[in-house]
Amino acid sequence: MKNKVVVVTGVPGVGGTTVTQKAMDILSEEGLTYKMVNFGSAMFDVANEEGIASDRDQMRKLDPETQKRIQKMAGRKIAEMAKESPVAVDTHSTVKTPKGYLPGLPAWVLTELNPDIVIVVETDGDEILMRRLSDESRKRDLETTASIEEHQFMNRAAAMSYGVLTGATVKIVKNKNGLVDNAVEELISVLR
C-alpha cells in the first residue's frame, strides 16, 4: 500500500526545511513518522551508486540526459519508500537560473513520485531578503524583493501545474517572521 507522498517547496531562505523538520518532530512524538527526503540528496545517492558522481558539485556537470535519468530514478526510489511509510520530499518547485526558471519536478519525476500534496512555504519577499542577508553560512545571489516575489509566484504556478498533472492538492503555508510555530501547526494539519 502506498503511503502519503508530500512535496514541500519554497524559495531559498523561506524556512521550508526548518518548518518541515519541526513538523516532523511533533508528528513523530504523536506516532506518525514521515521519512524526510531531500530530492537533491536522493539524486546524488543514485549518481554515487552508479559511480558517475562522487560529490554534489559533479552533479551539475552531468549531461542533460544523464540528469533526467537520475531524476527519474530518484523519484522512483522515493516512491518505493512510500510503500513503507509516509514520505515528505524537501525540494524546489522551481530553480532560478540565468536562462529562466527550471521546473523542480519535471513530468518524468512527477510520474514516478506521484505526490498526494504539494506544499509551498512562503512569506513576504522583504522578510526572505532580510533572512538571506543575515545568513552568513550561505553564498546566495543578491536579489531584490521584487525578484523574490516573482520567484514565489513562479513556485505557485509550478505547484498548481504539478497538481493538475497528478491530482495532488496544493497548500500554501505562510512562514512569517517570529511566527514559525503557526507555520508548523498549519503544515501539521495537512500532514496528519
UniProtKB/Swiss-Prot annotation:
Monomer. GO terms for molecular function: adenylate kinase activity; ATP binding. Its EC number is 2.7.4.3. Pfam families: AAA_17. Keywords: ATP-binding, Cytoplasm, Kinase, Nucleotide-binding, Transferase. This is Adenylate kinase. It is found in: Cytoplasm. The gene is adkA. Coiled coil: none annotated. ATP binds at G10, V11, P12, G13, V14, G15, G16, T17, T18. It catalyses: AMP + ATP = 2 ADP. GO terms for cellular component: cytoplasm. SUPFAM superfamilies: P-loop containing nucleoside triphosphate hydrolases (SSF52540).
